[in-house]
Amino acid sequence: MPYVLVTCIPVWLVAAITGDSSYIKAIDKIWENIVGKKIYITGGIGARHAGEAFGDNYELPNLTAYNETCAAIGNVYMNYRLFLLHGDSKYFDVLERTLYNGLISGVSLDGGKFFYPNPLSCDGKYHFNADHTITRQPWFGCACCPSNISRFIPSLPGYVYAVKDNQVYVNLFLSNRAELKLNEKKVVLEQETGYPWNGDIRVKVAQGNLPFTMNIRIPGWVRGSVLPSDLYSYADDLKLGYRVLVNGEEVTGELRKGYLRIDRKWKKGDVVEVHFDMQPRVVKANEKVVADRGRVAVERGPIVYCAEWADNDFNIQNIILNRHPKFQVTEKPELLYGINEITTEVQALGFDAAGKLATRDVTLTLIPYYAWAHRGEGKMDVWLPVNRIDVE
């Protein structure tokens, strides 16, 4: 894990307890540097294997990315503590991106095998894992990642809501039932959702008749922000929207630190419905990220997608993505424990019978990044070429 995270943990605690502005400024500067220059689109951090370290600013290689699973968990911890310190949804935007991509990619879908690093590209040859493999393993000599992720997953319910005085923050969208205390009075919320596969969320007040403010996080990806920095941006012209209704009546208002505030006297049976527009988006990296020049990534909601060999009968690293691609989203409940698959038309490069370079139109299939490497060894890419010069 990048050791700056370990070093900063007591600093966050001291800053929160004492309110010392010098500590807070230092922490904020570290966070700004990470999110603005050193984080992967998957939320992974720590580019270098050597020293388990951050690299220079904008040093974000894909094939050799380290992105230790423990560092992703540390990134969640860091952003959660900074949310508690500042009350800003941007920290949960980073936390959510990390959770759904660069963190759970570190464990197999059946929970029995683990990655140490989490690269964004695989050529089927470079042995990136801690034991010089390219598949998840049941254990490692240094077993911090398996034990750390096994500890983290059961703690996830504690990140869904936050409470301060008479305010409830709805930070993550997961089906759940939660008992919360607001000034010693109990409120029970029930959340139903198909998120992250769709953007429909239903929060019901199952118990509690009292006034309080419900703060609904409106994710950055809905509002046109990949991350709260200029490290990544959307390369398409889509404008996503959202709607929030209370008992069937639409609620509007300005966002405060990324939250829509609903202040009212709540009663048992009240229902909040949230609808996020969720479509595939094309993402580009800052030009200073050399590894991603001439390439784009695809995401939908908080999920980053990748191309993997198992779904495509051509070399996925010899393709050209259209500059204005059209996407098809298909539910695949039987595939990889249930996913949404994305397809689009691309050009595959190869050689014709005369040995000349030629292209052919093919359908490219994309799967969620976290689900890769479950069907054998082979190639994978998150960042896809849009120029012939950038093809392998």
Label for each model-derived stretch:
Residues 16, 32-36, 84, 104:
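Amphipathic alpha-helical segments of tetratricopeptide repeats
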Residues 6-21, 26, 59, 63, ...:
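Well-ordered alpha-helical scaffold segments within catalytic/enzyme domains
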Residues 83-92, 262:
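Carbohydrate-binding surfaces of carbohydrate-active enzymes
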Residues 4, 64-72, 84, 142, ...:
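Aromatic-acidic/polar surface patches that form glycan- and anion
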Residues 1-6, 44-68, 111-140:
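Carbohydrate-binding/catalytic loop surfaces
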Residues 27, 93-101, 106-209, 223-246, ...:
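C-terminal beta-rich recognition modules with glycine/proline-rich loops and embedded aromatic residues
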Residues 22-37:
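Carboxylate/His-rich catalytic cores and anion/metal-binding grooves
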